[in-house]
Amino acid sequence: MCGIVGYIGDSEKKSVLLEGLKELEYRGYDSAGLAVLSNDRLEVFKTQGKLENLKLELKNKEFLDFGVSIAHTRWATHGKPSSANAHPHFTENLALVHNGIIENYASLKKELENKGHAFLSQTDTEVIAHLLEETLKSESDLLKAFEKSISLLKGSYAILMLHKRAKESLFYAKSSSPLVVGKGKEGVFFASSLSVLAPKVDQFVILEENSVGRISLENFKDLNNIENMKDYAFEDKDYSKGNFRNYLEKEIYEQHSSLLECLEGRLEALSVYCEIDPEFLKNVSEITLCSCGSSYHASLASVYLFERLAKIRARAILASEYRYAHFKSNPNELFIAISQSGETADTLEALKLAKAQGLKTISLCNAPFSMMSRISDHTLLIRAGVERSVASTKAFSSQVMLLWLLSVYLGKQLGTISKEEERIQAKNMLNSVNAMKVEPKLHEKIKRLSKRYLHGHGFFYIGRDVFYPLALEGALKLKEISYLHAEGYASAEMKHGPIALVDSNLFTIALLSKHLLFDKTKSNIEELSARDSTICVLSSEILEIADDFIQLEESESYMEEFFRMNLAVQLLALEIAMRLNHDVDHPRNLAKSVTVE
């Protein structure tokens, strides 16, 4: 969601902070700002919109002397996007940035207003600044006052604060929101993500949950759990768009490579392997998959695979619902939490609840140092690489692939899948990887037909069995980047209400599998065609009633079909959004990493 950067040192602070914010830009934001304390002078700069606006504001500024500094990209939760609501928030003597949500800010704000504090913004974060100023009236020690103020907050937060009385230090607080600190030759650096620090630091610390402290160049060495950056491999990847029009297009094209990376060391000689000790999976009789957004659609798809291949009961639950639904747990239940970032707030809290209930836990994520990977029993990395675009493509595909592999591996350990079936599934996985190569003819056809789908009152994406979750994902992709209304449905559900919306101005994207329920799905498509919906069919089998037909190559299995259709719906969403002139990498109102509830 939001991004935090902090720096203590004598390098030029504007460039350090802006470079860090640029690395966090893909997470999504609507405003940005920074504060620098140097030579006894506190300066704050804030702008609405893109980082370019902040750069223009700072065009003639340089901060060359030693000092402390903080910066932030904001995604609005309390208060509209504006310069006033942007971070840092400040008083005469301090400035701070904050990721998270302060749940009791309204009552704290009322108390502070009664004591004479005047607020300039609509945010929950500004309350923290005034709360600290108020606390300092009775507690002169800065760290103690900071700790006392933090203890009054309810909610989630990662906070960095600088104060005129502490010219060589930054104060931090962390609870349910990521924050990392590291030290290198040029000083001490803070960030929301370790990847931002990797090129700059030799040592780093993932700050502990519910920790509060003060850090300077001198006392960094006193932190607990210091790790050496050289012990970890951070690939120096080319993050430029290259010849692609945007990062989303690039990442769609990268999926063949990212899926190969996902399977590296996990599929050899048509046998599947996994980093999880078979003993850990012994006696597992039920699986709960917990996630949000695209990860939830990957979870739904895997339910069919776990039940069909491993012969084990599985269910997919939205993380935001799991936390409050009081589900009865099973002692032999395996809880799988799925999140690209490994920091998704609802999924993280659901994982903590599962741990508290004594369940066996596995995290699937794309970040080796994420909070989810640190608290679960085991972590399986999807190895999708960095996704700059907010809309998930590589991560979704890799999640489905890894869950598919896990279903076969689990069946192998439980004795519910034969060696021959394992070989068949392994071959199908390799075929599915190859299916994710973008054929120029396919892309050109989708680009041409996309112009038909720019107007109307909405889209139905329909599919059955494992293609139902893919219909949900296809509809989500279109919604995210085109801002057109789209809904995914199980095909047979049309007659139970949604068909009332069908007319000549409604588009249907039909996922017609040759291998699963072909005749049933065809019948559902005919029902929609009879009511004048414009039908676009994705299939290897020609359907005469289709108004548009995206013919896919023949597939040997339904999962190979799944990945071929996945690629096609991603390209269709991309091309429709491009025709509508939208910023597909940074859709409005969306954040890449949702670290608040």
Curated annotation (Swiss-Prot):
Stored PROSITE patterns: GATASE_TYPE_2, SIS
Boundaries of every Glutamine amidotransferase type-2 domain copy: 2-218
Documented EC number(s): 2.6.1.16
The SIS domain, residue ranges: 276-416, 449-587
PANTHER family in the record: GLUCOSAMINE--FRUCTOSE-6-PHOSPHATE AMINOTRANSFERASE, ISOMERIZING (PTHR10937), GLUTAMINE--FRUCTOSE-6-PHOSPHATE TRANSAMINASE (ISOMERIZING) (PTHR10937:SF0)
Keyword Cell membrane set for record: no
EC class (word): transferase
Protein name stated in the entry: Glutamine--fructose-6-phosphate aminotransferase [isomerizing]
Subcellular location: Cytoplasm
Subunit note: Homodimer.
Gene: glmS
Catalyzed reactions per annotation: D-fructose 6-phosphate + L-glutamine = D-glucosamine 6-phosphate + L-glutamate
Source organism superkingdom: Bacteria
One GO process term, biological-process aspect: carbohydrate metabolic process
Active site: C2 (nucleophile), K592 (for fru-6p isomerization activity)
GO molecular function: carbohydrate derivative binding; glutamine-fructose-6-phosphate transaminase (isomerizing) activity
Pfam families xrefs: GATase_6, SIS
Cellular component aspect of the GO annotation: cytosol
Known function: Catalyzes the first step in hexosamine metabolism, converting fructose-6P into glucosamine-6P using glutamine as a nitrogen source.
UniProt key word Repeat: yes
Keyword field: Aminotransferase, Cytoplasm, Glutamine amidotransferase, Repeat, Transferase
InterPro entries in UniProt: GATase_2_dom (IPR017932), GFAT (IPR005855), GFAT_N (IPR047084), GlmS/AgaS_SIS (IPR035466), GlmS/FrlB_SIS (IPR035490), Ntn_hydrolases_N (IPR029055), SIS_dom (IPR001347), SIS_dom_sf (IPR046348)
Originating species: Helicobacter pylori (strain ATCC 700392 / 26695)
